[in-house]
């Protein structure tokens, strides 16, 4: 059972593989952002989607220890931690090589996530055995997804381009909301006794890709490939969302599009 204070249901995909997908895919996309002005932002966005899927799985694992009411809370908290890690990572360019900035942002976000989780267990008395691990994962996923989408908008992950294209414009605030919803919504929508990882992650892919389509629009006037980012994001969203809906139909006892459910004696 996925939401009965007993932890998540069985996983079809090991968490280690999803972590590898999020970290390696996210970092690869960020580093590729400046390779080419056309394909770079697309790769950065795809890397961000990889991180979102990783974060959604971590949300699924930690939020299964309860009724699911804390899903939005840990989502917003962890993405805010991730953004702090991103900003600190960008500022670290004054003490570390520029190529290390994404890794520093990831590490700082995950460390801060662990600190906040420890405070939650010690002060708030949250009795979740995997709180530290999952909060660190969600914060790291948030950092990579925000940095990936920011690089897609700005065209690179350098401090100056981020300040000019993402922070000064206020897009960083929009990315906070956008990435939070993309990471926390999948489990929030699928939680329940019959929740399973595969269906939840299909929805996570769809929220990641629709976010990618929106990020492309934010790049209008900032990078020449904004339309390609939006187009690929929208097409992939259609594929992912259809897969999610199909999985929901297959696993549902029955489907009713409108009106009230029939009474038992009317079946």
Swiss-Prot record:
Induction: Part of the probable mtrEDCBAFGH operon.
Top-level EC class: translocase
One GO CC term, this protein: plasma membrane
Coarse class of the protein's main subcellular location: membrane
InterPro entries recorded: THM_MeTrfase_su_C (IPR005865)
Compartments, as annotated in UniProt: Cell membrane
Superkingdom to which the source organism belongs: Archaea
Keyword Mitochondrion attached: no
Keywords (A to Z) from UniProt: Cell membrane, Membrane, Methanogenesis, Methyltransferase, One-carbon metabolism, Transferase, Translocase, Transmembrane, Transmembrane helix
Pathway where this protein functions: One-carbon metabolism; methanogenesis from CO(2); methyl-coenzyme M from 5,10-methylene-5,6,7,8-tetrahydromethanopterin: step 2/2
A biological process from GO: methanogenesis, from carbon dioxide
EC number(s) per entry: 7.2.1.4
Membrane topology, from the record: Multi-pass membrane protein
Functional description taken from the UniProt entry: Part of a complex that catalyzes the formation of methyl-coenzyme M and tetrahydromethanopterin from coenzyme M and methyl-tetrahydromethanopterin. This is an energy-conserving, sodium-ion translocating step.
The protein's name in its UniProt record: Tetrahydromethanopterin S-methyltransferase subunit C
Protein's organism: Methanothermobacter marburgensis (strain ATCC BAA-927 / DSM 2133 / JCM 14651 / NBRC 100331 / OCM 82 / Marburg)
Lineage of source species: Archaea, Methanobacteriati, Methanobacteriota, Methanomada group, Methanobacteria
Gene symbol of the encoding locus: mtrC
């Amino acid at each position: 059972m996925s939401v009965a204070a007993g932890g998540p249901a069985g996983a079809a995909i090991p968490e280690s593989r999803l972590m590898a997908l999020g970290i390696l895919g996210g970092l690869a996309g960020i580093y590729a952002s400046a390779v080419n002005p056309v394909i770079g932002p697309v790769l950065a966005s795809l890397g961000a989607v990889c991180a979102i899927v990783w974060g959604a799985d971590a949300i699924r694992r930690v939020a299964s220890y309860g009724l699911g009411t804390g899903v939005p809370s840990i989502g917003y908290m962890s993405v805010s931690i991730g953004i702090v890690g991103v900003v600190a990572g960008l500022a670290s360019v004054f003490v570390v090589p520029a190529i290390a900035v994404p890794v520093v942002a990831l590490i700082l976000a995950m460390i801060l996530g662990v600190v906040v989780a420890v405070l939650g267990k010690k002060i708030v008395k949250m009795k979740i055995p995997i709180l530290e691990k999952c909060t660190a994962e969600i914060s790291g996923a948030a950092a990579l997804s925000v940095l990936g989408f920011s690089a897609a908008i700005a065209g690179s992950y350098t401090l100056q381009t981020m300040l000019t294209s993402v922070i000064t414009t206020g897009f960083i605030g929009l990315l906070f909301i956008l990435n939070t919803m993309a990471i926390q919504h999948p489990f929030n929508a699928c939680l329940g006794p019959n929740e399973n990882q595969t269906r939840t992650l299909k929805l996570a892919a769809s929220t990641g890709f629709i976010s990618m389509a929106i990020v492309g629009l934010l790049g209008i006037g900032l990078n020449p490939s904004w339309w390609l980012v939006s187009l690929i994001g929208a097409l992939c969203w259609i594929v992912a969302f259809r897969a999610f809906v199909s999985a929901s139909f297959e696993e549902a006892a029955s489907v009713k599009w409108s009106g009230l459910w029939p009474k038992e004696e009317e079946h």
